[in-house]
């Protein structure tokens, strides 16, 4: 059974998020980490190799063009916490305008992406995937730039992985996370705003702020 949108949003508003043990487990549980992963929006680490890859182009980035495709891409791995109940819950949130995706395309194929939940000026990153080298890094670079440009104050990554840490994410105590969350919830942001996001523009803005 999927979680009703109002229950999901309330959970995020108090600093917890749902997970499942694996795709075939119908049970969903709430998680409240002692230490929380966050992505400082002015601290993205853009490596020279990633900047070169972005300058070469050959890819396109879109917003909310294929939310279900991103969700399924994130679930398409040997071990995943995205079970049918969670999938249905986030699709419902997306239809209500509270969950968004950023897609990376190449030659008409979805090669990477990230999705998350929005409340106020907080973006709760849920999962990402990559079907080509650097596709998830490109997605994150464009996502961080979009969050900065559209008024966000908090990018919650839930947990800190080595991959995220290499790109600039950090870990903070639960109490500090909740302080940042409260401030962000009182703010306003527009994830889907029309903005400039050319690869060169993203590189320039990230380089100026990191």
Swiss-Prot record:
Q: What does this protein do?
A: Functions in the N-end rule pathway of protein degradation where it conjugates Leu, Phe and, less efficiently, Met from aminoacyl-tRNAs to the N-termini of proteins containing an N-terminal arginine or lysine.
SUPFAM superfamilies in the cross-refs: Acyl-CoA N-acyltransferases (Nat)
Q: Which UniProt keywords apply?
A: Acyltransferase, Cytoplasm, Transferase
Q: Which HAMAP family match?
A: Leu_Phe_trans
Q: Does the keyword Amino-acid biosynthesis apply?
A: no
PANTHER family referenced in this protein's UniProt entry, alphabetically: LEUCYL/PHENYLALANYL-TRNA--PROTEIN TRANSFERASE, LEUCYL_PHENYLALANYL-TRNA--PROTEIN TRANSFERASE
Name of the protein this chain belongs to: Leucyl/phenylalanyl-tRNA--protein transferase
Gene Ontology terms: cellular component: cytoplasm
């Amino acid at each position: 059974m999927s979680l009703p949108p109002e229950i999901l949003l309330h959970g995020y508003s108090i600093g917890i998020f749902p997970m499942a043990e694996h795709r075939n487990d119908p049970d969903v549980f709430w998680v409240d980490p002692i230490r929380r992963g966050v992505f400082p929006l002015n601290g993205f680490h853009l490596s020279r190799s990633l900047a070169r890859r972005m300058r070469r182009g050959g890819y396109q980035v879109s917003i909310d063009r294929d939310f279900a495709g991103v969700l399924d891409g994130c679930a398409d791995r040997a071990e995943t916490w995205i079970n049918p109940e969670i999938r249905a819950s986030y699709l419902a949130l997306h239809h209500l305008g509270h969950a968004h995706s950023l897609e990376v395309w190449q030659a008409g194929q979805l090669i990477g992406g990230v999705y998350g939940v929005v409340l106020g000026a907080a973006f709760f990153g849920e999962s990402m995937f990559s079907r080509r080298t650097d596709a998830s890094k490109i997605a994150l670079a464009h996502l961080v730039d979009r969050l900065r440009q559209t008024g966000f104050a908090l990018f919650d990554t839930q947990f800190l992985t080595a991959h995220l840490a290499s790109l600039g994410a950090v870990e903070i105590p639960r109490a500090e996370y909740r302080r940042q969350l409260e401030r962000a919830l009182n703010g306003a942001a527009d994830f889907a705003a029309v903005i400039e996001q050319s690869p060169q523009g993203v590189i320039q803005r990230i380089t100026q702020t990191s």
